[in-house]
């Protein structure tokens, strides 16, 4: 503890993740639900990664980016869900200071990367529908790899900024994080000093990595809709709307909860409401992405048949 009463969490060695302790009667139910969705996430996303690697028909930009998204979702959920399951299962709800730093860094990094990657995926669909004759030039494999690397680098760079700013803030007295994982708004609530600079930085970068990507995605799909409406083929219309509709659903399931959490000051959030919103985009959305992208996809169904030897 400092002379002025402020606590450096590293000297204490741990944080207490309050999580859903206020509803002990719900913890078993939440544990079962979270475990089911986590297993769905692991199975569904591993399935997409393996299938995209094994089937040559899926060696296209769309499935390259989808494999990146699947790997991203695997990492994103694994950065917080195992800790949540441990806390829900038993009375021990602590996380080490180093563990909290690592978790905060990866949750932020992977979440930001997903925002950028979804923009890249929308651009790929725009190029495929609106610029079909130039698609192979626009989405050259080398350029696709560059876009994927840029997505990951931007996410991890942004996270380094926020993580360092957050853990420089001195804490006051207690170490109870009113959340189920280490997150910037929840950690800023522990501070006894003015955190307006941190909150402003969070809102600015959230606008850059949430609002701007969302605008770019909606612009891409707006152009796609206009191009599709000019098509004469009913089959083409159904195929394009089916693919783009699935992408937009995945975008909505990720961006809407993220905006509710990060585009307002930590003091403006209902803490309990924030937990359930975060539970949705860290548990539910990653498990639904494989279903959304592949459920009605004839190319994926064909790849499965070839892999199983049914064709």
UniProtKB/Swiss-Prot annotation:
One MF annotation (Gene Ontology) recorded for this entry: olfactory receptor activity
GO cellular component: plasma membrane
Keyword RNA-binding: no
Disulfide links within the chain: 100-192
Keyword Disulfide bond: yes
GO biological process: detection of chemical stimulus involved in sensory perception of smell
Extracellular membrane side: 1-28, 83-103, 162-198, 263-275
Protein name: Olfactory receptor 2J3
Species annotation: Homo sapiens
Gene of this entry: OR2J3
């Amino acid at each position: 503890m400092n002379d002025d009463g402020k606590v450096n969490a590293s000297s204490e060695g741990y944080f207490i993740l309050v999580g859903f302790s206020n509803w002990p009667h719900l913890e078993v139910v939440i544990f079962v639900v979270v475990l089911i969705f986590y297993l769905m996430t692991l199975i569904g996303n591993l399935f997409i990664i393996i299938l995209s690697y094994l089937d040559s028909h899926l060696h296209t930009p769309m499935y390259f980016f989808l494999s990146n998204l699947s790997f991203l979702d695997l990492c994103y959920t694994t950065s917080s869900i195992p800790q949540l399951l441990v806390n829900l299962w038993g009375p021990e709800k602590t996380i080490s200071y180093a563990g909290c730093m690592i978790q905060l860094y990866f949750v932020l990094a992977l979440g930001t990367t997903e925002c950028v990657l979804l923009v890249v995926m929308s651009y790929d669909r725009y190029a495929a529908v609106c610029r079909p004759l130039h698609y192979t030039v626009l989405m050259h494999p080398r350029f696709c790899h560059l876009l994927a690397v840029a997505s990951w680098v931007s996410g991890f760079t942004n996270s380094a900024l926020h993580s360092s700013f957050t853990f420089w803030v001195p804490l006051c007295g207690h170490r109870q994080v009113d959340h189920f994982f280490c997150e910037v708004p929840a950690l800023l609530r522990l501070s006894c000093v003015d955190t307006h600079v941190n909150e402003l930085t969070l809102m600015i970068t959230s606008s850059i990595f949430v609002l701007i990507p969302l605008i770019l995605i909606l612009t891409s799909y707006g152009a796609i809709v206009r191009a599709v409406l000019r098509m004469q083929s009913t089959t083409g219309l159904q195929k394009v709307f089916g693919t783009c509709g699935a992408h937009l659903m995945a975008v909505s399931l990720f961006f809407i909860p993220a905006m509710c959490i990060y585009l307002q000051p930590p003091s403006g959030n209902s803490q309990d409401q924030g937990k359930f919103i975060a539970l949705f985009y860290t548990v539910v959305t990653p498990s639904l992405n494989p279903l959304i992208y592949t459920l009605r996809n004839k190319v994926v169904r064909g790849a499965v048949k070839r892999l199983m030897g049914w064709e």
